[in-house]
Amino acid sequence: MPIQKCKPTSPGRRFVEKVVHDHLHKGAPYAPLVEAKKRTGGRNNNGHITTRHVGGGHKQHYRIVDFKRNKDGVPAVVERIEYDPNRTAHIALLKYADGERRYIIAPKGLRAGDKVQSGNDAPIRPGNCLPLRNMPIGSTLHNVELKIGKGAQLARSAGASVQLLGRDGSYAIIRLRSGEMRKVHVECRAVIGEVSNQENNLRSLGKAGAARWRGVRPTVRGMAMNPIDHPHGGGEGRNKGIQPVSPWGQKAKGYKTRTNKRTTKMIIRDRRVK
């Protein structure tokens, strides 16, 4: 899709660069698959901030997306491709042969009128969902399950994909965009192709207000704070004084935070290894 630069009719428009998507549906979403989305403002049930830089923004409705793709053997036709404010990828509205409609993450190149299918005998075509044991070696995949039947957890954002490198017994070996190589059970499902809207990282919001519309609040540097507010605060001039840490003192660079030893054995190659 082309990148459109806006004319500098105002300071806020001068740096705006947006991706043009002519194939997206212009109307409202499919109402039966839409539900209310309550905002948290980054607070938990006690009212304490647990996620900083979150709050405000335009009201959004949540689109119920099918990540399990468990309607096997029933062909579906893509009715339309839609924008989803809750994710960077686009979504596709499917109409199955029995009349049911579901949203899925739209793969790259999928358009209205295309046919998709899920199941063991689904053809190898972008948008089709199969178990990893039925995928050709070297395939580009997205929406990969980590647990059988749980639903897709890997490679769900715009432009994301993984590559199937091989199979070893009851496990498939995949490589993520980060460089990590890991084992996933061959009965876990994945979708052929990569996720749509791969130009998402090329856009420029152009002004702070565009981020506020999306519910993103300002990020204040620790060095700009007082000593009471952050370990980097205070001092004369721009003086950090210590190695980079979080507001609560945890090391920000090189410190491993992963503690799930149960699934560490599934990681063949760490993403930090160059």
UniProtKB/Swiss-Prot annotation:
It holds the Pfam family Ribosomal_L2. InterPro entries: NA-bd_OB-fold, Rib_uL2_dom2, Ribosomal_uL2, Ribosomal_uL2_bac/org-type, Ribosomal_uL2_C, Ribosomal_uL2_dom3, Ribosomal_uL2_RNA-bd_dom, Translation_prot_SH3-like_sf. GO terms for cellular component: large ribosomal subunit. GO terms for molecular function: rRNA binding; structural constituent of ribosome; transferase activity. Keywords: Ribonucleoprotein, Ribosomal protein, RNA-binding, rRNA-binding. Residues 229-239 have a biased composition (Basic and acidic residues). Residues 38-57, 224-256 are annotated as: Disordered. One of its GO terms (biological process) is cytoplasmic translation. It comes from the Bacteria. Part of the 50S ribosomal subunit. Forms a bridge to the 30S subunit in the 70S ribosome. NCBIfam families: rplB_bact (TIGR01171). One of the primary rRNA binding proteins. Required for association of the 30S and 50S subunits to form the 70S ribosome, for tRNA binding and peptide bond formation. It has been suggested to have peptidyltransferase activity; this is somewhat controversial. Makes several contacts with the 16S rRNA in the 70S ribosome. HAMAP family: Ribosomal_uL2_B (MF_01320_B). Belongs to the universal ribosomal protein uL2 family. This is Large ribosomal subunit protein uL2. It comes from Acinetobacter baumannii (strain AB0057).
